[in-house]
Amino acid sequence: MVEIYRTDQQVLNTLTDIQDGCWINMVDPTSKELEQIAERFEIEPEDISSALDEEESSRISLEDGYTVILVDIPTPEVRHEKKMYTTIPLGIILKSEAIITVCKVDTPIINYFVRNKVKEFSTKKKMRFIYQMLFRSAFVYQANLRLIDKKRIEIEERVDGDTSDTDLIEL
């Protein structure tokens, strides 16, 4: 899925076509969508699709005419009917006329921007947008770590008494 946004007077608008200063958000894009964006912006297809590989490591690379930023962001996952915490790659491609984000799944971090919850968010101020995304990611990491630590303390208190196999597995 490819969605195009642009802020005008601090309001995030959905666009039907690509314009200067826009944000192109790609969530689990098809190969055709990847090809179209790669061709339109003269980006190597591998640079866009690298964010879809869960094993891809974080990096920043300066390419000819664009910058690729790949970071792991936190995302919730349900396994065995329990909420778990994991990370997935988020690709951010910076071009002079647009910013492109690529992710395998729809994440709370990107949705925070789509819902226009960030103060002074502008798709035209690309570096600020990147900093805001990284800050939001760090904020979610911290919130998740607090929840994990709280759960760890609860389990440790239970383990002090009778220890069962499920307590050890949870820990």
Pin down the residues of each PLM region:
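Peripheral, non-transmembrane regulatory/ligand-interaction domains of membrane transport proteins
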Residues: 1-171
